[in-house]
Amino acid sequence: MVRAKRKLDHIEYALSTGQSRTHGFHDIDFVHQSLPNSNYDTITCETKIGELSLSSPIFINAMTGGGGEKTLHINEQLAYVAKQHNLAMAVGSQMAALKDESEAASYKVIRKVNPNGIFFANLGSEATIEQAERAVDMIEANALQIHLNVIQELTMPEGDRDFTGVLQRIEKIVLNSKVPVIVKEVGFGMSKETMQQLANVGVTAIDIGGQGGTNFAAVENERRQRMLSYFNNWGIQTATSIIEATSTNNNLSFIASGGIQTALDVAKAIALGANTTAFAGYFLRILMQDGIEKLVDEIELLHTDLKFIMTALGAKTIEELQSVPLVVKGETYHWLMQRGIDTAHYSRR
């Protein structure tokens, strides 16, 4: 019951605290193309995460599950939306269902709604090989997300305090998993050093989960008697984290998430090097406040606007969008220079 109550608290406080929008994309400007030589009607948006082919560079990221009927209904609606637009979708952490079988229905519902969809299972980094296998089987997942949430756990009144052995557990899961493993942050971003460590143990896909979206430190602080306010602005902004990711020069696939709300955010994230983008809090807010059909319509508009932007840039495919020229400026530029990451190549390609 404690875990289920926490799941419901997370939804309530995530909606009430909102998204910070400090993702850093305001520091990214496209170089205008007066002769784009493009046609809106021939723009395609297919992409890949590792070996997984996706029809869209937008997917529904991990949000909830394990909180009884309310979270079952949310996942049911999100699965319907995913089916309408042929989007991939991740569920929230399934540890609740591994601890309490009665909560499994709140996750399994997605396969009932969308039998042929692409779904990602989800567990924390404390998971064992056996738990990872059970989570994948529970929803017949196409991939497994392992989330890293140190700051959330430290801020959570009942959270973990021991983070030793995490990389070793991830390596074991990667070696034994029958589906691709995606390691994700939850709103605090990832450094290039962290991503290189993950690549070294066989991880092939990372969701950078940057600062700028739902702030789980703020969410957990709402549940505390004594706030740890110093964690409320902790993390690496989304745009910065994407560039840190691409600077590692390995074969990782990257998912950009963290405050992404518009087609321009999507386009900038992909142009910086992401393979796809993920929406969570923004979609949840629309669903809860405006209803399921409004969310279906919003995603349609996102795709339309993304194709407009790609047309303006002369990018006929997602792969071409990844190589359009842009300029990195402001706080993002200064952070990256201090980190020894040169951004000039973005403006000269």
Swiss-Prot record:
Q: Which organism is it from?
A: Bacillus cereus (strain G9842)
Cited HAMAP family? Idi_2 (MF_00354)
Query: For binding Mg(2+), which residues are annotated in this chain's numbering?
Result: 153
Cofactor(s) needed by this chain? FMN; NADPH; Mg(2+)
What name has this protein been given in UniProt? Isopentenyl-diphosphate delta-isomerase
Does the record bear Methyltransferase in its keywords?
no
- Residue positions binding FMN: 62-64, 93, 122, 184, 214, 258-259, 280-281
**Pfam families under this entry?**
FMN_dh
